[in-house]
Swiss-Prot record:
Organism: Vibrio parahaemolyticus serotype O3:K6 (strain RIMD 2210633)
One Pfam family hit: DUF1414
Family matches, as HAMAP family: UPF0352
Assigned protein family: Belongs to the UPF0352 family.
Superkingdom of the organism of origin: Bacteria
Name assigned to this protein: UPF0352 protein VP2129
């Protein structure tokens, strides 16, 4: 079942494009990009989510990340 979002694809894509431009400007490697993304997620959880909800939301975030990864097709 697809997950519905309260945010439009346009909103998400616009912000994603702006972030991508900043990372490109700084020639951020994939490793640095993932480190930055992880730090952003950690900061959001620690600063904007109630302590009682952090673990649950982090687990849901991790599950969503894992489910969004493309798996290589085997023949």
């Amino acid at each position: 079942m697809p997950i519905t979002s309260k945010y439009t694809d346009e909103q998400v894509e616009k912000i994603l494009a702006e972030v991508a431009l900043v990372l490109e400007k700084h020639a951020a490697s994939p490793e640095l990009t993932l480190m930055i993304a992880g730090n952003i997620a950690t900061n959001v959880l620690n600063q904007r989510v109630a302590a009682s909800q952090r673990k649950l939301i982090a687990e849901k975030f991790a599950q969503a990340l894992m489910s969004s990864l493309e798996t290589p097709k085997t023949h």
